[in-house]
Amino acid sequence: MKILTQDEIEAHRSHTLKGGIEGALAGFAISAIIFKVLPRRYPKFKPSTLTWSIKTALWITPPTVLTAICAEEASNNFDATMYGSGSSSEDALDEHRRWKSLSTKDKFVEGLSNNKYKIITGAWAASLYGSWVIVNKDPIMTKAQKIVQARMYAQFITVGLLLASVGLSMYENKLHPNKQKVNEMRRWENALRVAEEEERLEKEGRRTGYVSNEERINSKIFKS
């Protein structure tokens, strides 16, 4: 039975919590679509006419289900990474220690940088919907003109977000100029450590008379 270290417990909790938060956000987005988008697309579907119990169930079911699923998946993925073969377990612990040592500002900047494309995609979709809601109130423009106008607003916002992401990447590189080299060196060190450990165990097995199945099959007694 393996005794977990405090770093392993904290890393597992962090990965599970992150997966749960991502699932909750996705679930609330689905709930918002159910209550805001579907009634516009299907006028016969009117959530306002439903009872409070049904509306509550429709609202909390997607985030509850996705929170549980994503948290469980994150936990399983972490276990597979930590307790599988190879140097990935050391990489996961080193990454957790590095993240834990960062300041709140550095965590915020790195979090934005690591998820910038998700943020840009979500902001583009939100800006497209928001601009359509605003433009759709114009009684003069045709529907085609409204679509073009809403898309122009969304593209303008997306260009601004892309420029902001470039600036964010430059700022992060300025804060950590050798980050990529350090990570690459750490991976090589962990891989060498695992290789040395496997070689040591193999030598110990030979000294104690332990023979693997592959060695038994390749031995002379199995050959005609």
Curated annotation (Swiss-Prot):
Mitochondrial intermembrane compartment segments: 1-13, 76-103, 174-184
Pfam family, one: HIG_1_N
Membrane topology, as annotated: Multi-pass membrane protein
Ranges of residues in domain HIG1: 89-180
Record keywords, A-Z: Membrane, Mitochondrion, Transmembrane, Transmembrane helix
Effect of inactivating the gene: Increases frequency of mitochondrial genome loss.
InterPro entries linked to this entry: Hypoxia_induced_domain (IPR007667), Rcf2 (IPR040153)
Tagged with keyword Lipid metabolism: no
GO BP annotation list: mitochondrial cytochrome c oxidase assembly; positive regulation of protein-containing complex assembly
Subcellular location: Mitochondrion membrane
Any Gene Ontology CC annotation: respiratory chain complex
TM region positions: 14-38, 48-75, 104-133, 143-173, 185-204
Note: Present with 12000 molecules/cell in log phase SD medium.
Function: Assembly factor that plays a role in the assembly of the respiratory chain supercomplexes (SCs) composed of ubiquinol-cytochrome c oxidoreductase (cytochrome b-c1 complex, complex III, CIII) and cytochrome c oxidase (complex IV, CIV). May be required for late-stage assembly of the COX12 and COX13 subunits. Required for the generation and maintenance of a normal proton motive force (PMF) across the inner mitochondrial membrane (IMM) by preventing proton leakage through an inactive population of CIV that accumulates when RCF1 and/or RCF2 proteins are absent.
Complexes and interactors: Associates with a subpopulation of the cytochrome bc1-cytochrome c oxidase supercomplexes. Associates in substoichiometric amounts with complex IV. Interacts with COX3.
Protein name: Respiratory supercomplex factor 2, mitochondrial
Native organism: Saccharomyces cerevisiae (strain ATCC 204508 / S288c) (Baker's yeast)
